[in-house]
Curated annotation (Swiss-Prot):
Keywords: ATP-binding, Kinase, Nucleotide-binding, Nucleus, Phosphoprotein, Serine/threonine-protein kinase, Transferase. The active site is at D147. SUPFAM superfamilies: Protein kinase-like (PK-like) (SSF56112). Its main location: nucleus. Belongs to the protein kinase superfamily. CMGC Ser/Thr protein kinase family. MAP kinase subfamily. This is Mitogen-activated protein kinase. The lineage of its organism: Eukaryota, Fungi, Dikarya, Ascomycota, Pezizomycotina.
Amino acid sequence: MSRSNPPNPTGSRKISFNVSEQYDIQDVVGEGAYGVVCSAIHKPSGQKVAIKKITPFDHSMFCLRTLREMKLLRYFNHENIISILDIQKPRNYESFNEVYLIQELMETDMHRAIRTQDLSDDHCQYFIYQTLRALKAMHSANVLHRDLKPSNLLLNANCDLKVCDFGLARSAASQEDNSGFMTEYVATRWYRAPEIMLTFKEYTKAIDVWSVGCILAEMLSGKPLFPGKDYHHQLTLILDVLGTPTMEDYYGIKSRRAREYIRSLPFKKKVPFRTLFPKTSDLALDLLEKLLAFNPVKRITVEEALKHPYLEPYHDPEDEPTAPPIPEEFFDFDKHKDNLSKEQLKQLIYQEIMR
């Protein structure tokens, strides 16, 4: 094992990486709440990789996210989902306090791409197509990603796209009480479907489809469509564009409190997407309209979206693989998460790495 200190662009502190001597650590490429990502070279093969160092053991929530991430990224084997090439095995359980995931190195992410350049219509088509292609695999496995946003779509120079960060993912099949969902739901609200904010007893695959709609809108215009400052502002921005829900959609909202809240708001007329996106093609706007349907029941599915004429240049039903449904016990730890101590979660992570 070698301890390497990659150069830190902020210069504020040293970051130590306890990884195998097979890896030559290069630069810090990203930093999050409980992890750092460095680029590295795998010396035996010369392959460039990303090494994600995670220190999750201070918080149960970070442990849960790490466990979900490891289990799901190992489960999926898909061109548009980031893969784990290896996980650094710790020396022993006693000294185990960091997790190192070795992954494919991607050059940038959608958030940076949108901020630094105008994306062509062809780029938008290809990126949304790849996102939906990944989502088809997830949804066929009965997995909801729940945190799709531009920074979780990794890109390289060939315009290959890979979805990452499965820390909030959940089984779509488990409809046990989801009230714990919001406590852990620290995801960016800008890409959150309206039904998540209006009631959190049930959520479906349609929440991911809404996020794809928000991402497409942002790629087309270069700025977020619904940049809410808080819960109320978020809903207001959505209704400012989509208009007050129809009676049918209004009664589709399960929660009485949520219905009363909507009723208390002033009536809004729908703003035509053509007004918001004057330079965008009719086909792109038609898909956007279907992705951003207020009522999740009326929202387009991933399979339907892949067949939409806007994506026709890329759609190939023979090359859009599904994944087998995840077994019932796959998310067992999530069912018992409120009763698991940090030590028990650490043991589960250790077992997952060592398997």
